[in-house]
Amino acid sequence: MAKKQPREQKIKISPTKGRPMLNWVGKKPLDYVKGYPAVLMEVFDPLKTNLRYDVPKYENLEKNWQNLLFYGDNKDVLATLLEQGFRGKIDLIYIDPPFNVGIDYVRKVQLRGLKTSKIEGEGYSAIEQIMYFNNFLEDTYLQFMYERLQLLKELLNERGSIFVRMDYRFGHPIKLLLDEIFGKENFRNEIVVNRTQEFFKSSRGLKKLMVDTDSLFFYTKSNDYIFHEVSVKREKEIWWEITLPGEHK
């Protein structure tokens, strides 16, 4: 007897704030998503404790969610989390999405007895596997991000925060999307993040100023949010001498 397939459920999505609003060809807010289990789920052991973990069942996912690694389209995974009771339960979200740099990322797969050859009509060899797409049409990319940011908002706790990393290519339009979805009043900071030294080396010889930073956009779900002050202890104390009001030495 064939195994019964899980029934898809329609999960309603809340409307966006709506102002300010960015428009593009094919823009369509998500009204609902179809909830069904993500393709594969594993337990991640970041501390390398070597303890044995059993992959939790979907019906127990809400009570046993630590250190889970999902495989599959992130939109399907977010829909799975919504279906399994995580709406409004997530305190902190960080995403580092594709920047739409115009290049798809691939990895080489070693296959015994197979010579390297190009697949007809494709730009990849037979032993290269696409890791993720990073080459979208502009309108397609904005819709891609729009849908996923809407789902992330559904998962975020009312006192929760989200951090979205972007670079100069689409940082400005993504900021407008975040304003539309989370509300401009819930924007907290644009945090500047330095890039690696490897990027500096690849930028030599360009006839323009080097771009050596990314932006991390910090938004909250509401005005009543959790925030822990960030501070670093100085190795040596520094005394500021004030000579005139507003002037420092």
How should each PLM-predicted stretch be described?
Residues 1-249:
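Core catalytic lobe of class I
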